């Protein structure tokens, strides 16, 4: 059976979600949303930003940790 391909995007989002890391999502428009990743799938990210916000991945420019200390486990 073939091994699933390495997906750094899913790994980053999942670790951020599990560890409740506060992230800043910068949108393609330049708007910034700060909150916690609640869930995600192939096309969207559900973020706790005052209330639940569903963000389509194609509208996201970058995702960074709010305090800059987050490191992806290898």
Identify the residue ranges that each predicted region occupies.
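Short glycine-rich, low-complexity segments
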Residues: 1-34, 38, 42, 46-74
């Amino acid at each position: 059976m073939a091994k699933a391909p390495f997906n750094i995007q899913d790994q980053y989002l999942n670790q951020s979600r599990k560890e409740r890391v506060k992230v800043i999502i910068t949108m393609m428009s330049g708007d910034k949303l700060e909150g916690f990743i609640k869930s995600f799938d192939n096309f969207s990210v559900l973020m706790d930003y005052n209330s639940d916000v569903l963000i389509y991945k194609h509208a996201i420019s970058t995702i960074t940790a709010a305090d800059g200390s987050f490191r992806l486990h290898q």
